[in-house]
Amino acid sequence: RYIDSFFRPFLKGIFLDDPEQVSASMFRFVFRAFSAGDAAIPAAGMSALPKAMRQALKPGTVITGVQVVHVDRHEVRSADGNQWTAKQVLVSAAHERLTGQNIPELNKSWRSVLNFYFEAKTNPIKRPILCLNANPNALIGNFCFISDVASTYAPQGRHLLSCTHVGEASWTETLQHQVHAEMAGLLSLPYDALIPLKHYAITQALPAQQRVSPEPRLLQTENGIWLAGDALANSALNAALATGRLAAEDMLRV
């Protein structure tokens, strides 16, 4: 009973997959992490993490909001015609599309998710906790009044509610209404007590975790482009950071 009421919905929200389909080593990693520390979010939003890393770099070093259309060993070109040259190039996302090469070691199976955000006039939970829905037929797997975790996420007197629908990331107005109604029912609130704000359909949210690499894999394509990212190891920020760091260390040795 405890497995079905806690572990199954909890782990499904983490891995975006049925726990039976996930490597046992990833379960041990996640369980150890949650046992050793507290779950937290940055007060300024998740973008605060890369922004903090960028602050250590010279102004102009990091360029965002640019669509990259071509990458080779020493050059990167963008859709607006700009190009940058470098001694070496590293790709950490959309590896095959950007390099134009087949990469057998890459995890090409992805799990998707839909996130819904609502403004709530009242908060029946009143605690900074993640609420799990153990009903296997429910649309909502988990939810949280995220402004209870970080008060900066909502204006004073209002509450930001986040809920997750694991599965095909295909949003429709019908699904929006169904999730809205189910969420109101779970909280015993009237439908109009929740105001839809935004939804995010993420088709490639996490790489599948049936088999994971115990150690981050360092790879170069045939034409010498370096590769990094969680799809080369496991679906955790740790893996994304570790593959990037190890690749950078190897690049400096060349």
Where are these regions (language model features)?
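Conserved flavin/dinucleotide-binding core of flavoenzymes
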Residues: 146, 152-254
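A structural signal for the hydrophobic beta-strands that form the central parallel beta-sheet
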Residues: 62-64, 91, 227
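Aromatic-acidic/polar surface patches that form glycan- and anion
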Residues: 42-46, 101, 107, 172, ...
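Mid-domain catalytic core of redox enzymes
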Residues: 69-176, 185-186
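PAPS/PAP-binding and catalytic site of the sulfotransferase fold
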Residues: 49-56, 90, 179-185
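Short, hydrophobic alpha-helical segments
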Residues: 57, 84-85, 90, 248-254
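Active-site/ligand-binding neighborhood in enzyme catalytic cores
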Residues: 1-75, 86
